[in-house]
């Protein structure tokens, strides 16, 4: 430990991890020691325990072995459960942490972050409604904590609190619960102060949080709400880029392709500017990658509306590839799976087999999400596979049980009047 943090903490982290290995060897039956040992090892490789294909990194097994040993001794160990969720959420078997995730919120009901934590597993296993509910409870716990403790911790106020709102908005949107997604997206935006938006090194994350209502409105085809949004301040480059993206989607959705193309041009000019690219990152990914996905998606949607599918589909395939290459984080740094737009275009051009493959792959990433199930059902119907389509319809019925909007088609829900925006006090 050093009172002044060094520019490179690696030597200190390595010394601490080696010291904790020695302590674990002395106290192998103490679950707290085992959890602290795992935590020390995790800090050597933060958020880097699994490759994109789910293969474990060379150091991962030592970490999970320590945590599992701690949980074998004490299945209710809060620290070990917290670490276990983070250690396996990006794996191909996140469900192994599910029994522990199910109990964590009740073990620590006043700690907002821990109440929220099960959502990291629920998102991966398709329990979107449970994720939404946990994050709603987490925001209540956060409100209690800040009221009692009057916390002025920037990390807590600017990171953990909006993260819970953001996560809940994401899963509410996946499950088709528009009113709650609106509420949670607004809460995400409202958690960010002007000071956070102007803070060097944090402005990208802050702007991503503030953009959440736009992303949710795109998901639910709330085109009029998007077009009613005022232009963000000139210095909020990522937020302005997403504003142009959302407006482009809205104009395209309403059939005004000339205006949609104008918004695409403005998006491209802004995202390729030196000032925007100097922001470097948003969330855990490069701003270049995230905004290129926005451009490719909007362009692909416009071209699809013009029935220029031979041009649209390659752009959407490129968007999928970039989306798949993004560094893992939850919620993902790109809100709308590009595969949903790609599958819709493939169906429109008559390539139902390719659309089936697209939606099946999406469902592997986001299990039982209703948006992809709707597309998969259409793909089976287009291929004359009525029995398979009926099976998927049953799954879609279950996936949409908590929704407050009509069942989606492959491209989303039909454009309609927006769901009413609830006040936060109505939760």
Describe these PLM feature segments.
Residues 36, 83, 117, 124, ...:
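"A position-specific structural signal for the A-helix of alpha-solenoid helical repeats
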Residues 123, 129-143, 172-191, 261-272, ...:
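TPR/TPR-like (Sel1-like) alpha-helical repeat modules
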Residues 26, 71-73, 103-110, 141, ...:
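Solenoid-like repeat scaffolds
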